[in-house]
Amino acid sequence: VHRRWISLTTLIGHASNRIVHKLDAPVGATLLVATAQLMLLDRIPDHAVINCAVDWVRKNGHPRATGFVNAVLRKITRLRSEIIETGVAGESDHFLRGDGSAWKLVEPVFKDSIDFQTGFSRKSWTRLVHEFGEKTAAEIAVGSIAEAPIIVTAPENENLPDTVLQHDDSRFGVVPQNVDLANLFMSQPMLRAQDPTSANSLDLVKDLNPRRILDVCAGRGTKTKQLRALFPNAMIAATEPNDVRRAFLEELAPEIDVIVYKPNTDGPTEPFDLVVADVPCSNSGVFARRPEARFRYDKKHIDSLVELQQEILQDARSILQNKGHLLYATCSIDPAENTSQVPVN
């Protein structure tokens, strides 16, 4: 539901002539969940979805809304024609699905609105088109609908678990949905959940020989673990301003021999040979993994991020050893967060 929120509310609005967020919250939530089941989950019979939704609304204090919920959901089933193998962004009668297929609709629900068809806010879509053009923007938007797989990798001296599927890049594996993630990581602690594109950024520094390394904005420690695997003899420190993520980092730190600097403690007393700055960004390169990013990717948000990124880079340079190396990384595809930062720093 989260991933397809805007597409679902557009369809519900078309079927009901009502704005979903103005409905009583339990009624709107029921319609969203039921519509997602009708459009995206093929194994659940329509009558089961509708009966369950109506029954839930009745039992949870909204008996007067049962007729409305029933009518809207039945209208949605009548809007569907057939599932076609390949959906097309821009076809107003296509409800796109994550596997590339689409429900062909009997009415033009998404007329002139690729943004709503793919689940982007209007401001985010405007930014996407401005930066990349409508054709590429549509390709990016369609790609964001798919549910991204969980990908793992291991240090060079370890093999991937037998339970994972081979990725196109032999260093990585795709975790099947039936594998217990907790057991997987407990059995192999140095395993990392990491995409190839994220991991590959550290390939730029793997031939260096740094004595002291700092990972700023370390999050839960994914790149920190990778740094330890690359540089087993280096002193490695990490920082993370978010309390929740830093708690995970602190739990990991003893296992990989990393110092975690806290906001209320003394920082480093010596400069670093290598500083890794994987900075907060718009997540525009990972829309499929961060569905919420499609709602906030606009000029105002990008401008605030660019300012924050510049501050982090300036701080990073201030603790960098003379002739040291600074690795700047984002998971954004927006030029303002990437190449445009180079002249400033």
Whereabouts are the PLM-identified features?
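Rossmann-like S-adenosyl-L-methionine
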Residues: Q166-N345
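Class I Rossmann-like S-adenosyl-L-methionine
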Residues: V1-V179, R228
